[in-house]
Amino acid sequence: MKRSWRSGLTLVLTATLLAACGGGGIAALSNSESKDSTQISSYPDARTEGAELLSAFYGLDDAIPFLASYRICGSLGNSDGMPVIFSEEVDIATLQAGDFSVLLNDGSEVKPGCVTPAPAADLGEIRTMLMIGDFGSIDNQPTTVEITGNIVSMDHGTNFLGAKVDVTPLEDGPALVHTEIVPEEDWELGKESSGLPFGGGTGCPASTQQVVRVVWAGGVTKPGGDEVDNVEREAYQVMALANDTLTTVTPFALGDLGDGDNNHELCLDVTSEVVRIEFPAGLMTDPREDLNIATSITLTN
């Protein structure tokens, strides 16, 4: 059965993305409110039990370019960038910059100047929120991110208030933090990249039998910034059960390319039960050119 709540919210998100493509620009996806303005009484089923942050990745220190900062946040200035990944997709109507608190190594506390789901704004990706602001420096790094406001999951069943996670240091490379089977109604087979830096990733080929989404702690490319290709595709190892035997499957294609985010779709030509994803060290880098670590993630859904 299709998830009716998600289908409705997907229509809202799609409308938001279309507005961003028009006059509103990418800034239409961002929020710079310094205080929590979510009326939590409107979400009576939202519970804090089980709410988690999967990662917070200190990816860039004073290195988001002037133009990008202006387009995203409406303000100029070289800024820090830190993606925060939630255990569930988020209803962005409940998202304010003031919902986040960042503790630095010296004990001081700061908040982001703005937050946005971009560039991870394709269908099924609204669990990664990019914080932009001043989060210390390489000598005084952020240590913890905590949700201090009411951020509600897309299904309105979870409130992330109080969730916290340790920050991955600036010098560390990206790792896998989440994987899931993509529901068939979300596959978008044959979709071409829009060429935009948000919401425009490619779909898997028409012959795909199963799609697995993997989420990295931060955006990943080849060293130097080029998009991944067959080298990285062949490096992905999918552990799957076939007739009670664990086998290794290589994706025959990759999807969700061309949009500069932290997600890849592994396009499989088998329907075996996926158990785990593995990826070796040293093939991809974050925007700071830190190489990825050897990493694996177990499927939980």
Predicted regions and their residues:
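Bacterial N-terminal signal peptides that target proteins for export
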Residues: 1-9
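Bacterial N-terminal signal peptides
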Residues: 10-20
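Non-catalytic beta-sheet/beta-sandwich ligand-binding modules that flank or precede catalytic cores
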Residues: 22-301
